[in-house]
């Protein structure tokens, strides 16, 4: 499925349009399949993809992507008020990334 986070084929972080790699916003075997089905993928340039997986800043980058992914998922699939939508996302992916109380 096409990304619901960012429709343009460019790096999520810097906007580069070359040397792109597809990144699944949600990790793990089950969540990766769900992310594919729900469109929770983004393109990253090779530099940012390596930085995400290898650097000390990777966790911050990963959390930013997860928050963007959850917000996009709620806009596309959520039903009800924001609290209900967050609960729906949490049920599907096991965690809420928008609510700081869950971190």
Listing of model-derived features with the role each one plays in the protein:
Residues 15, 46-49:
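Cys/His-coordinated zinc-binding microdomains
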């Amino acid at each position: 499925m096409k990304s619901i986070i960012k429709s343009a084929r460019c790096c999520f972080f810097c906007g580069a349009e070359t040397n792109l790699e597809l990144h699944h916003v949600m990790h793990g075997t089950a969540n990766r399949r769900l992310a594919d089905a729900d469109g929770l993928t983004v393109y990253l340039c090779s530099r940012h993809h390596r930085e995400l997986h290898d650097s000390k800043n990777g966790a911050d980058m990963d959390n930013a992507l997860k928050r963007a992914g959850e917000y996009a998922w709620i806009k596309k699939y959520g039903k009800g008020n924001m609290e209900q939508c967050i609960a729906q996302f949490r049920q599907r992916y096991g965690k809420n990334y928008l609510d700081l109380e869950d971190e």
